[in-house]
Amino acid sequence: MKEKLQQIKNTALEELNKISNKAELENIRVKYLGKKGELTQILRGMGKLSSQERPVIGKLANEVRGSIEELIEKAVTEIKLKEKEAKLKNEVIDISMPGRKQTVGRKNPLQLTLDSIMDIFISMGFSIEEGPEVEKDYYNFEALNIPKNHPARGEQDTFYINDDVVLRTQTSPIQVRTMENQKPPIKMIAPGKVYRSDSVDATHSPIFYQIEGLVIDKGITFADLKGTLELFTKKMFGEKMQTKFRPHHFPFTEPSAEMDATCFVCGGKGCNVCKNSGWIELLGCGMVHPDVLRNCGIDPEVYSGFAFGFGLDRMVMQKYELDDIRLLYESDMRFLNQF
């Protein structure tokens, strides 16, 4: 039995030294170590040996098995190395050949418009502030005068992470955090992505961009709000643009309004975009509610302020006469090359 085991070891070693590919290696493995392999059969027959022979032969058989497995592992490494060398040899790269022309991307109209808006507000003395998109319920609702069970919460289908954490439905939480962390005067805008539980169609998306602004100082009035927004509108769309304000209601501002602007497609003459009214709804705004100021540690008897906000996607769709919001998020170069 000892001689047979030694012969198996020597034969296996000899055969392993001659192999040149994985298939031959697998055949040798099966021949000696497979279910019906020569060494496997010997190990299965150990029970027929005497009690004196069994430990001696068992030890030798395991040593032979270990030697063969070690040789097979070494052979696998050598074969992989040879295959890699052969592949590298065959994959010769002619560095003198001209390279492939890379397609140059284009800025999305959302980003183009956002850049223009930020440049305008920076020129007006505003700072750009950012905040988390995964937000606490307190900052998204309660600090903005929207307590639990408030009717205004029903207007926004919210993605809840848990009872206290949401995907922000507006960039207003950035205003709250700014008021908490900075002392007045404050003059900032907060652009960013917001989330609503909407089904995707031509005019709705669960993710869209919003820009909100905030000014806090002593003696701020509604006249400051109107002047700021009228100046922004003229800088953004041209000196001929007109604006008008309509009373509205928001829980975080009082008084509140919506601002309409001359349709920038037809210039106020009437078209499909403005539904032949000559006006388009541009943004919501109002004087910051005293309770919101108190929630942020600002005394409403000393300071006042205004806030405003608008959806960037809607503005871009109106400006470029787009009929499908999905075009803004598909990264189709045929579409982007038009801007």
UniProtKB/Swiss-Prot annotation:
GO terms for molecular function: ATP binding; catalytic activity, acting on a protein; magnesium ion binding; phenylalanine-tRNA ligase activity; transferase activity; tRNA binding. Mg(2+) binds at E254. Its EC number is 6.1.1.20. GO terms for cellular component: cytoplasm. One of its GO terms (biological process) is phenylalanyl-tRNA aminoacylation. It holds the Pfam family tRNA-synt_2d. It comes from the Bacteria. It catalyses: tRNA(Phe) + L-phenylalanine + ATP = L-phenylalanyl-tRNA(Phe) + AMP + diphosphate + H(+). Gene3D superfamilies: Bira Bifunctional Protein, Domain 2. Belongs to the class-II aminoacyl-tRNA synthetase family. Phe-tRNA synthetase alpha subunit type 1 subfamily. This is Phenylalanine--tRNA ligase alpha subunit. The lineage of its organism: Bacteria, Bacillati, Bacillota, Clostridia, Eubacteriales.
